[in-house]
Amino acid sequence: MPRPIHASISLAALAHNLDVVRRHLDQAAQAAGGAPPSIWAVIKANAYGHGIEAAVAGFSAAQGLAMLDLAEAVRCREAGWGGPILLLEGFFQPADLDLIDRYHLSATVHTREQLDMLAQARLSRRVDIMLKLNSGMNRLGFDPDAYGSAHARALQLREQGVVGAVGRMTHFACADGTPGVAGQLRVFQSVTQGLADGPVSVCNSAATLRYPEIAVAHGAQAHWVRPGICLYGASPFADADAASFGLRPAMSLRSQIIGVQDLPAGAEVGYGATFRAERPMRVGVVACGYADGYPRHAGTGTPVVVGGVRTRLVGRVSMDMLMVDLDPVPAAGIGTPVSLWGQDGPSVDEVAQAAGTIGYELLCALAPRVPVKRDS
């Protein structure tokens, strides 16, 4: 018999979250008197741990998909996705352009070397590109003083039949908090003002939820947003949970109690004996540890749901197991279901906060050894 741990991926929750984002953007567009943007559903890192094929099915109503990895883009095509696909880091060597050509992909361009590779490529069709501006995050993109010349070269490649649409994009560093997006948005608008029309994309999850008005399209200008984490039912914000936006968790990590210990007062639990029972208590052993993707740094007090009752983790997380306080669940015993996070448990963001990290990391870190079930 396999260990009693598995992750469930809800396709209905994925579709619901996409619809929540779409309605949010529709309302912003109506208020601003413009048109709502199109949505690139971001499915990088194996769809934030949820699986590429599940994401293709769950996000079937999106206008496009965005990711980093060429192999994942190919999997999308093999899963039946026929719409636009954007490679968020573009390409790294000339051979990548052969796959981009074959599978009809679009690419982010953020270096002169990528423009050089495009100029030397022999492709069967034009490649749509998004020219990225470094507006202040200082990660990827052309600096403001180099962007104009890079854009001009992209237009030359378009005239030569190599490039199709030439879009403009940037990435916000602080859309989830202070100082927000105003400074970077000013840089983006100043640098790109007057450049030839093409699609524009500036909003990630946080900006899409908090500043949807900046993605509203006016006139013939096409806008795209790039929501990621919110589509999986987790929050990009430290000060607002996903449920407050109407989002539902798409991944649920579940296991069972596999052992019970009746402890006297003063007994210690787990590696390092970091937890000591203040009174006689029952402790349950759960088949889940850091080798399954549960955060090792989650300490005593991290929320867990056992048999439908909220309780707490006690002691250190082991490689394959963790321990929970069963006093709030007197009927619990071996075989009692446990929800580590998800639809019937604490939110992944709660667990992440207790471990000093973010929900993104936990979702992406689900271990390959954990069986995954897809729910419709």
UniProtKB/Swiss-Prot annotation:
<dbReference type="Pfam" id="PF00842">
    <property type="entry name" value="Ala_racemase_C"/>
</dbReference>
<feature type="binding site">
    <location>
        <position position="139"/>
    </location>
    <ligand>
        <name>substrate</name>
    </ligand>
</feature>
<dbReference type="InterPro" id="IPR029066">
    <property type="entry name" value="PLP-binding_barrel"/>
</dbReference>
<dbReference type="InterPro" id="IPR009006">
    <property type="entry name" value="Ala_racemase/Decarboxylase_C"/>
</dbReference>
<keyword id="KW-0413">Isomerase</keyword>
<dbReference type="GO" id="GO:0008784">
    <property type="term" value="F:alanine racemase activity"/>
</dbReference>
<comment type="function">
    <text>Catalyzes the interconversion of L-alanine and D-alanine. May also act on other amino acids.</text>
</comment>
<dbReference type="InterPro" id="IPR000821">
    <property type="entry name" value="Ala_racemase"/>
</dbReference>
<dbReference type="InterPro" id="IPR001608">
    <property type="entry name" value="Ala_racemase_N"/>
</dbReference>
<dbReference type="GO" id="GO:0030170">
    <property type="term" value="F:pyridoxal phosphate binding"/>
</dbReference>
<comment type="similarity">
    <text>Belongs to the alanine racemase family.</text>
</comment>
<dbReference type="GO" id="GO:0005829">
    <property type="term" value="C:cytosol"/>
</dbReference>
<dbReference type="InterPro" id="IPR011079">
    <property type="entry name" value="Ala_racemase_C"/>
</dbReference>
<dbReference type="GO" id="GO:0030632">
    <property type="term" value="P:D-alanine biosynthetic process"/>
</dbReference>
<dbReference type="InterPro" id="IPR020622">
    <property type="entry name" value="Ala_racemase_pyridoxalP-BS"/>
</dbReference>
<feature type="modified residue" description="N6-(pyridoxal phosphate)lysine">
    <location>
        <position position="44"/>
    </location>
</feature>
<feature type="active site" description="Proton acceptor; specific for D-alanine">
    <location>
        <position position="44"/>
    </location>
</feature>
<protein>
    <recommendedName>
        <fullName>Alanine racemase</fullName>
        <ecNumber>5.1.1.1</ecNumber>
    </recommendedName>
</protein>
<feature type="binding site">
    <location>
        <position position="319"/>
    </location>
    <ligand>
        <name>substrate</name>
    </ligand>
</feature>
<dbReference type="Pfam" id="PF01168">
    <property type="entry name" value="Ala_racemase_N"/>
</dbReference>
<feature type="active site" description="Proton acceptor; specific for L-alanine">
    <location>
        <position position="271"/>
    </location>
</feature>
<comment type="pathway">
    <text>Amino-acid biosynthesis; D-alanine biosynthesis; D-alanine from L-alanine: step 1/1.</text>
</comment>
<keyword id="KW-0663">Pyridoxal phosphate</keyword>
